[in-house]
Amino acid sequence: MSTAKFVVPKAVENVRIEKFCLKLLPNIKLSQFFKLLRLGKVLLNNTKAKLGQRVSSGDTIVFQFAIEPYLHNHSEVVDLTQVQDDLQVIFEDEQLIVVDKPAGVVCQPDAKHELFNLANSLLKHCGYNQYFKNSLSFIPRFAHRIDRNTCGLVIGAKTNQALQELEAVFRHNLLMKQYQGLVFGPFNFKGTQKAYWAKDAYQALVTVKAKPFPNAKPITTIFENSKYLTKLDLSLLTIRLVSGKTHQIRACLNLLNTQLVGDRKYQLLQFKNRNRDFKHQALHATNLSFAQLDKQKFPLLANYSQRQFKSQLVPWFASLIKGVSI
């Protein structure tokens, strides 16, 4: 039986095993790796590995299958010469960086935006002219993302410890995310919406329902304020995410029988004609606020307890609602 053994390097701390292994084996499909996990073909410290387990420096991973087909040249270099340092920085110190992302910019590289994206702009801002693709070494990165056509605040880490703690902050919902959005028609719901969310990876869509359904996870969205703009037949909303799932706000609005202005993916039939003239969805990530952080659990980020960041970007839909605030 073919086996391969790896010792997790120093730069890696508290990373999900599937995330680590997919970087190590860049040509393996996620479904293939999950199957190998279920079959016990991946060992972590001499014990059958499980999905979601976390690995750190010094841990030993053994693959009990031929890994050669899933490898490629780890020295592949991404040249950032053409990338501009055009970040709109709201806050920056030695550990963290908070930026305003314009609508239309993707947060992470993908097939259509391999070079020009927010992640590469961050690297250029931090002095990188190149980096090694699929490297397991730490590089500055954002701890979350917002949709391409959403504008506003994104927070990233400039050190490995800051990244690990920041990811834990997100997992425990200790960073409040507030948005402003514009929807069609009057909006009468106010308060906390508890629902259930599941993602269809093949269609890049999510489903949100009021009651539990197979493979769904609970989510919480708070609709804090709304103002109906009578002449425009639009409503301006203030929304706070407790959980932070993909397309959460957009799909939750569908559950309430409305949608964001400009949203094509979650477009409702009754708004199709009115929705044609808008290029981006009307959603703006306006505020990020740290909760009170435990010094023992977050030795680095505890210093940012109660710290708030406010977007300085003027969203594209501001011209529609000039003079309106909620």
UniProtKB/Swiss-Prot annotation:
Domain S4 RNA-binding: 15-76
Identification of the protein by name: Uncharacterized RNA pseudouridine synthase MG370 homolog
Domain of life: Bacteria
Leading EC class: isomerase
Species this chain originates from: Mycoplasma pneumoniae (strain ATCC 29342 / M129 / Subtype 1) (Mycoplasmoides pneumoniae)
Reaction catalyzed: a uridine in RNA = a pseudouridine in RNA
GO MF term list: RNA binding; rRNA pseudouridine synthase activity
Gene3D superfamilies, alphabetized: Pseudouridine synthase, RNA-binding S4 domain
